[in-house]
Amino acid sequence: MKASVIIPAYNSKERLYNSLLSLNQQECDEEFEVIVADNGSEDGTLSMLESFQADFPLIFTRIKENRGIAYGRNQALRNARGDILIFHDSDMLAAKDLVAKHIKAHENEENLVVCGLFWKRIYSFYYERFEEEHKEQLAKLTGEMPKKDKQKLLEEADIKNGSFLDKSFDLDTDFIDVLKKILDEYGDDLKGYHMPWRFFITNNSSVKRKHVVDLGLFDEGIVRYGFEDYDLGIRLHQAGLTFRLRRDIVSVHQEHPSNCKSVDDIRANIAYMCDKYNNIRSLDVHLAFNGPFPPDMTNRIMADIQKLLESQKYDMLLNLFLELLHVVKERNIDPDWRKKSPRVTAKSFDLQTVRKLLPKAKKKLGVNDFANALYALVNDLLHVDLRSLDVV
């Protein structure tokens, strides 16, 4: 078996049907299978899977209780036989060449992570629980508002003949804008970009199965919505794999009410990730989630950090930087942070030694961006001007 398409599903029967229908249209000479983990759905997903007429080996497993996306994906992974894993969610519509291009991309590439295009969107159904922004956008696109829940907005013929691609649109958010600007600067090969795992989004990505198995699959400790793909991407990056964006490998997300129950999910996931990667060799994680710096400066800081990591004599600077990013995290995710005792104070660190060491590192290694960032954090969070050690 050349490839296994991994799909977790939860109460998405109608969108999953469309997704499987798009996979039925694949123009691929290689053998591939599709594995669906029904993650405790209550909408008849299992009966749909049992009756679906697939043109490929379709394997599905029923999980009685939803234990998170990571758990569901792992259940599917344990049944996978393919050399290549293609991650493709239940709400995604695959272009006809998606599977073939993912497989082809890994030819003669042992250590590659392929990140397909992930910002295409389409309205295949109307949902009464849509957020207002969805309803406003849908009204602009269609000229009128559908009247009943789960009203079909996309015909099967559109999926079979591929015309759904012409009806799709780009997701327009600050997050996507940031990622597009990163691609403009560093290219689709992401050379020189130190956080390529940010592009590993498991609705359209692939990697050889052996790497995921070696890393212990997805982290089932992540039970709230999101971040399990980031976590695996971080570990793939730390294992030395190369990341590459492929704009020509296209899948389209079928819009639906958000699975994120509240901002608390995001806060909890950030806290979990920062605790898990609480070391100076994972500062990219803390900068990505908590860093108060612009994206271009953030990457330059990471380039400086790579230089500093080459010698243990600068670990004091990096540990201080890490601890201060934890303080930024607590400010960002804890609404009551002002009422609590500070995590650290100026007395928590040997700032006299830091004051002497930082200019030396700056002069020897040219780590100007890191130095400026550390000066700024110490000033803002510890109320100390590190250049003079005068209390502000």
Curated annotation (Swiss-Prot):
Major enzyme class: transferase
InterPro entries on file: Glyco_trans_2-like (IPR001173), Glycosyltransf_2 (IPR050834), Nucleotide-diphossugar_trans (IPR029044)
Highest taxon, organism lineage: Bacteria
Cysteine disulfide partners in this protein: none
GO molecular function: glycosyltransferase activity
PANTHER family xrefs: GLYCOSYLTRANSFERASE (PTHR43685), SLR2126 PROTEIN (PTHR43685:SF3)
Family: Belongs to the glycosyltransferase 2 family.
Protein name: Uncharacterized glycosyltransferase YfnE
Species name: Bacillus subtilis (strain 168)
Organism placement in taxonomy: Bacteria, Bacillati, Bacillota, Bacilli, Bacillales
Designated gene of the protein: yfnE
